[in-house]
């Protein structure tokens, strides 16, 4: 019921806030710097809309879990993916695995969907192998293609359609992947990694 209300608000309220559309960091957001050998990527995270994904990401980051990991899946004009300690896309687990079965049954934690977050260019989202299988892997949307003319106005808010002019992957929207952050500086680094 709340999701339906939020969707209606996102679609009809011209004052609806889409946090990805601003580089300003709100009080209820977190900022993280991802350091790579190509440069730094600064992201803001959205715990209000994706509390599990943000807590998992921040805890792993603070614990050094992500240190030295490769971007093991790199597809130019699509996305770059990391977070797997095995480096091949088959590894990684959530901070709750084996500790809290109410959050991670053993297969990963649940998807979090918000009609205020989308797979826009620069969006961070959890990579998974199906519903509710989120572990430690995440991707950054890198696609530069303008999708705005291809998006149905009954499914995407006008401000988001406008934002998709800059690229992203709207085919990943709809709740299958938890969007939990947005690059606010260093998108050029994301492009360097993708190339």
Give the positions of each predicted feature.
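Cyclophilin-like peptidyl-prolyl cis-trans isomerases
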Residues: 1-195
């Amino acid at each position: 019921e709340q999701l339906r209300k939020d969707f209606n608000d996102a679609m009809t309220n011209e004052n609806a806030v889409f946090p990805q559309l601003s580089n300003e960091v709100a009080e209820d957001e977190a900022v993280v710097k991802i350091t790579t050998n190509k440069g730094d990527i600064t992201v803001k995270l959205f715990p209000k809309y994706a509390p599990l994904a943000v807590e998992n990401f921040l805890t792993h980051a603070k614990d050094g879990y992500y240190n030295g990991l490769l971007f093991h899946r790199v597809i130019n004009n699509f996305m770059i993916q990391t977070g797997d300690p095995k480096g091949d896309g088959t590894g990684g687990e959530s901070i709750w695995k084996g500790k809290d079965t109410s959050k991670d049954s053993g297969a990963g934690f649940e998807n979090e969907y918000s009609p205020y977050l989308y797979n826009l260019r620069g969006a961070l989202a959890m990579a998974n192998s199906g519903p509710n299988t989120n572990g430690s892997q995440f991707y950054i949307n890198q696609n530069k293609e303008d999708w705005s003319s291809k998006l149905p106005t009954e499914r995407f808010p006008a401000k988001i359609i406008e934002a998709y002019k800059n690229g992203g992957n709207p085919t990943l929207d709809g709740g299958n992947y938890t969007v939990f952050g947005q690059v606010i500086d260093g998108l050029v680094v994301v492009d360097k990694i993708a190339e």
